[in-house]
Amino acid sequence: MNLIDQIKNTLIISCQAVDDEPLNDSYVLSKMCYALVLGGAKVLRLSQVEHIKKIKEVVNVPIIGLIKKHYDNSEVFITPTIKEVDQLVDLKVDIIALDATLRKRPDQDLTNLIKTIKTKYPNQLLMADCSNINDAINAQNLGFDLISTTLRGYTKDTLNHNNIENDYQFLKDLKKVITKPIIAEGGIWTPQQAKEILNLGIHSIVVGSAITRLHLIVKYWNDNLK
């Protein structure tokens, strides 16, 4: 069974920390990921070279890897250039996730970046982090292996929107036009939501904040106790 089939109907856990987040420490994240795998996590979504290296020392599950890197001339920061792709290939991550929005990139445009990746690394699986339908259609046409909704709510035109609103209407609309496997990421806080999304025919789901970002989990509880 290939990896894409293997992750169908799977709970993918995102365990990341950057900048001044309190858990931004490779040792801490490696222990968290070890605990996640003990709990049954089958696939992890991870960022940053030093973190991925350390985590790979203690777990042996498929990894969706990305590098968050900010450049002065672009809003794109998830694996924005071929340099970050090269680093992730060196780490031997199973799937590389990159921003697939139509926004201006710091180096090559998305079309040429994908051509470069497919020439250098023809067997590398790629996940498109999208924000809207147009991103997803373009990513599918460019040959991405997986289409993810990671960036919905994080771009100017999708601000204040998410994957859950209006009874998952965005995911339903996406399913009508995308034939590649769709990965739902963002805004999923309960197992019930996860089940309902998978029942739409979505390939698999990514949950991060609701499981691995302690400050947001506490905030969620406090907000719901009011």
UniProtKB/Swiss-Prot annotation:
Root EC class:
isomerase
- Might you give the EC number(s) for this enzyme? 5.1.3.9
State the encoding gene: nanE
An example GO biological process term is: N-acetylmannosamine catabolic process
- Read off the InterPro entries from this record: Aldolase_TIM, NanE, RibuloseP-bd_barrel
User: Pathway, per UniProt?
Assistant: Amino-sugar metabolism; N-acetylneuraminate degradation; D-fructose 6-phosphate from N-acetylneuraminate: step 3/5
UniProt superkingdom: Bacteria
Q: What Gene Ontology cellular-component terms does the record carry?
A: cytosol
Could you cite one Gene Ontology molecular function of this protein? N-acylglucosamine-6-phosphate 2-epimerase activity
**What functional role does this protein have?**
Converts N-acetylmannosamine-6-phosphate (ManNAc-6-P) to N-acetylglucosamine-6-phosphate (GlcNAc-6-P).
Name of the protein in question:
Putative N-acetylmannosamine-6-phosphate 2-epimerase
- Reaction(s) catalysed (UniProt annotation): an N-acyl-D-glucosamine 6-phosphate = an N-acyl-D-mannosamine 6-phosphate
- What SUPFAM superfamilies does its record include? Ribulose-phoshate binding barrel (SSF51366)
Q: Name one Pfam family in it.
A: NanE
Instruction: Return the similarity comment.
Output: Belongs to the NanE family.
